[in-house]
């Protein structure tokens, strides 16, 4: 299993990805992880990752606690299926992509800047791996 994090658009602050990169580097001990900023008109995630599970962050998505998020990662590991995560841009997700997602997930009922959502998602991925392996980070 490999984890891909895609973000639509670039952050305003060039240092905004540092925290997300740190958590993904830590998660990389358990599974290869890749993070990239994209433009929807230049990539088709279904062609690039035909068998991967597409999990997109959306305010109207399914609320999920950390234990359920870890279970989702575990399922991906057991199936050997890549996980593709996407955080939309300032205008949200492209409607056609939103409709095709395998799962829409909400990080919170609150609204956060996209830069913070990147860090929060990366941290939850790392936390999920730590939960599955009883790593002391989760305590």
Curated annotation (Swiss-Prot):
Primary gene name: rlmH
Stored Pfam families: SPOUT_MTase
HAMAP family: 23SrRNA_methyltr_H (MF_00658)
The protein's name: Ribosomal RNA large subunit methyltransferase H
Record CDD domains: RlmH-like
Molecular function (Gene Ontology), one example: rRNA (pseudouridine-N3-)-methyltransferase activity
Family (UniProt): Belongs to the RNA methyltransferase RlmH family.
Residues annotated for S-adenosyl-L-methionine binding in this entry: 57, 88, 107-112
Reactions listed under catalytic activity: pseudouridine(1915) in 23S rRNA + S-adenosyl-L-methionine = N(3)-methylpseudouridine(1915) in 23S rRNA + S-adenosyl-L-homocysteine + H(+)
TM region positions: none
Organism classification: Bacteria, Pseudomonadati, Acidobacteriota, Terriglobia, Bryobacterales
Annotated compartments: Cytoplasm
Signal peptide: none
């Amino acid at each position: 299993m490999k984890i891909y994090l895609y973000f639509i658009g670039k952050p305003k602050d060039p240092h905004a990805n540092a925290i997300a990169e740190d958590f993904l580097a830590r998660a990389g001990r358990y599974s290869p992880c890749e993070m990239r900023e994209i433009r929807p008109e230049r990539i088709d995630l279904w062609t690039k990752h035909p068998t991967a599970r597409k999990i997109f962050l959306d305010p109207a998505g399914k609320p999920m606690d950390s234990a359920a998020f870890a279970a989702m990662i575990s399922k991906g590991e057991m199936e050997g299926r890549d996980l593709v995560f996407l955080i939309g841009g300032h205008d949200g997700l492209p409607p056609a992509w939103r409709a095709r997602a395998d799962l829409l997930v909400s990080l919170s009922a609150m609204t956060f800047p996209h830069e913070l959502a990147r860090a929060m998602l990366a941290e939850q991925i790392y936390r999920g791996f730590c939960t599955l392996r009883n790593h002391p980070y989760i305590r």
